[in-house]
Amino acid sequence: MSECYSFVVNGVPCSTEEEKPLLRYLRDELRLTSVKDGCSEGACGTCTILVDGKAVKACVLSTKRAAGKEIVTVEGLSEAEREAFVYAFGAVGAVQCGFCIPGMVMAGKALLDQNPNPSEAEIKKAIRGNVCRCTGYKKIIEGIALAGAILRGEASVDPALEEGEDYGVGARAFRTDVRDKVLGRGEYCDDLYLDGMAHASAVRSQYPRARVLDIDPSAAL
């Protein structure tokens, strides 16, 4: 009899009989594509989620080890948290390509849940396992700090800044895709799921100047 692994994802009980990386279950079964697959080996942090309140990389946690745990992704943030992070990251310019941002947000949430008013050094430590190739981290650090201030009630949200009511030369403005990228709704190629979708992988010869005489496709069928 196969074993069943049960856990709670964003408040919803889930279970599976298949032991595999939690990342694959969240993306392929639940379609929670805010959990990005940047490396599949725990190096980049784009798949950062909360597991029992702690920041964890979903690609290195199996469904078996996740059994009995409470899991939260960006989709499971409260309305107040979503609005705080969207505004903060947009206001400081923390979003560029956006691929790393949901993981940064979850690392930031894990910190703010434990320490609502962190120092810059504490924010840097909290995101040390998250890689960003665009921003140089400064804006992301500022974004987490501002999100914390908003959630503490020490900073306010200016809706006009996001809505762009007074755009003009030299005016501050959000990127138009900030909300989707912060909340993990921006679609990248790997986020597309189609019925009957096939996958391909490049296979290269181990030998230089080798001539391919035959291909056995049985493993792929």
Segments and roles (model prediction):
Residues 1-162, 179:
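Signature of N-terminal electron-transfer/Fe-S-associated modules in redox systems
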Residues 148-221:
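Flexible, low-hydrophobicity surface segments
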